[in-house]
Swiss-Prot record:
CDD domains: IHF_B
Functional description taken from the UniProt entry: This protein is one of the two subunits of integration host factor, a specific DNA-binding protein that functions in genetic recombination as well as in transcriptional and translational control.
Organism of origin: Bradyrhizobium sp. (strain BTAi1 / ATCC BAA-1182)
Record's protein name: Integration host factor subunit beta
Gene this protein is translated from: ihfB
Key words of the record: DNA recombination, DNA-binding, Transcription, Transcription regulation, Translation regulation
Stated family: Belongs to the bacterial histone-like protein family.
Entry-linked PANTHER family: DNA-BINDING PROTEIN HU, INTEGRATION HOST FACTOR SUBUNIT BETA
Assembly information from the UniProt record: Heterodimer of an alpha and a beta chain.
Any one Pfam family match given in the protein's UniProt record, by short name: Bac_DNA_binding
GO cellular component entries: chromosome; cytosol
GO BP annotation list: DNA recombination; regulation of DNA-templated transcription; regulation of translation
InterPro entries for the chain: Hist_DNA-bd, Histone-like_DNA-bd_CS, IHF-like_DNA-bd_dom_sf, IHF_beta
Length: 103
């Protein structure tokens, strides 16, 4: 699912809201999550999961084409840990061995 599909589904479930208003709300939520992560804050949505930033130290890498060693700078990467309720629902709705689909 892409963001526009998410906006459309939320608008369909809330006919009293205009789709452009839903889009503005979704964008505002995502912007606030990104801003909080940029400040170094952790964002926790109970039952859904928690967003945080992990810091990767500088390291020595290798150019796969030439084999030459190259320095890789330290970097910050976003990290998401699912909440307990989400994990339970995913495991209940998609038992082990069931085929995954990209719907």
């Amino acid at each position: 699912m892409i963001k526009s599909e998410l906006v459309q589904r939320i608008a369909e479930h809330n006919p009293h809201l205009y789709q452009r208003d839903v889009e503005n709300i979704v964008n505002a939520i995502l912007d606030e999550i990104v801003a909080a992560l940029a400040r170094g804050d952790r964002v926790e949505l109970r039952g859904f999961g928690a967003f945080s930033v992990k810091h990767r130290p500088a390291r020595a890498g290798r150019n796969p084409r030439t084999g030459a060693h190259v320095p890789v700078d330290q970097k910050s990467v976003p990290f998401f840990k699912t909440g307990k309720e989400m994990r339970e629902r995913l495991n209940r709705d998609n038992p082990a061995g069931a085929a995954d689909t990209d719907d």
